[in-house]
Amino acid sequence: MLMAKLSDQPFVTEISVITEEVTPIAPSIRNMEKACLAIITTSGVVAQGNPDKFKAVSNTKWGKYSIHGLKDMKEGKWDVVHSGYDTVYMNADPNYGVPLDMVRQFEASQELEKGCRFARLYPYFYSSTGVGGVTSAMQHVGKEMAQNMKSEGIDGAILVST
């Protein structure tokens, strides 16, 4: 194959190229001031004790954890399950991965421009990790999360990546 390529001859690769499914862009939210938003994170923040048994690498699960009544993530009890970054800082302040402190400030602000306000924050956040994940498994996780959000009447999401 190398010799053919160097000689400008046709060649066939020994490794098949994977064609990814194209995901269409979602339409804009028509009326943000009536919208319910959810927080989604890939930081691996989970409820204390890791009740959904996330794996630090090649995780195939997602979880949904209550933030009802919390002003920020430091008020809750959380663990971080992720091997793609140093979790020391996230364990010290989970707001880095689930920016509840900032979203609550945004939610309460009366000074936002029209069209930037939203009606409410969904009282749970969604979490998973993608480090070392197989694409098909991550697509499955994403589809399950999206179906759950749709069934809960969530209009949009704030996706926090690590």
Where are these predicted regions, by residue range?
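An N-terminal assembly and electron-transfer interface module characteristic of large anaerobic redox
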Residues: M1-T162
